[in-house]
Amino acid sequence: ELESGERIEGDLFIDCTGFRGLLIEQTLNTGYDDWSHFLPADSAVAVQTESVGPPVPYTRSIAHESGWQWRIPLQHRVGNGMVFCSKFWSDDEATSKLLGNLAGEPLTDPRVIKFTTGTRRKHWNKNVIAMGLASGFMEPLESTSIHLIQRAVIRLMQMFPYDGVRQPDVDEFNNQMKFEIDNVRDFIILHYHVTNRRDTKFWRHCSSMPIPDSLQHRIDLFRET
């Protein structure tokens, strides 16, 4: 039901309402698995700057005391941001660090974004399928969000409920999405956990924090071989 009172009916709904999850969470109360204990970064500050010289053909990810900075060259500007953990840096500290490490003049004011890394307990619940930020959030260290959206779209095309929603299809969709998202989660955690950096409380925390059994298994296999 819309704010106007108009009622929209349908057999299948795709929830693309971002962090709010208007259908998957606020309507269906699907639940959210919080992964902050695995990926402690919970904030970002972003700013656009002028380009300085020809754009390089890659994105830079630069480690800092309590997080990391992105620098993305675009056609007419550069995207910059700092991902950080609010337990170790305040918004002002992160913003100051970012502004002190820019290559060009800022074009926009810094904008702070808060997030909770994690995933919906079900991506497909009843006749609602969550995609994008409505399905969960993975910090942008490897820009995996677009990949996960593409995978969800392809999977829905392969399993589209032409004859109506059936629970076995729903369960299989959720199982496949969970497997894929868990792999991406472990991939991102690995960047933090296996680093040799120990010079700040943040990096010492990352090296000693608990990790999923699935990732520990892979690390053990790698070390044994």
Model-derived segments and their meaning:
Residues 33, 91, 100, 148-154, ...:
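Solvent-exposed, non-transmembrane amphipathic alpha-helical segments
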Residues 64-116, 134-150, 159-166:
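Conserved FAD/dinucleotide-binding core of flavoprotein oxidoreductases
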Residues 117-118, 173:
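Beta-rich nucleic-acid/ligand-interaction surfaces
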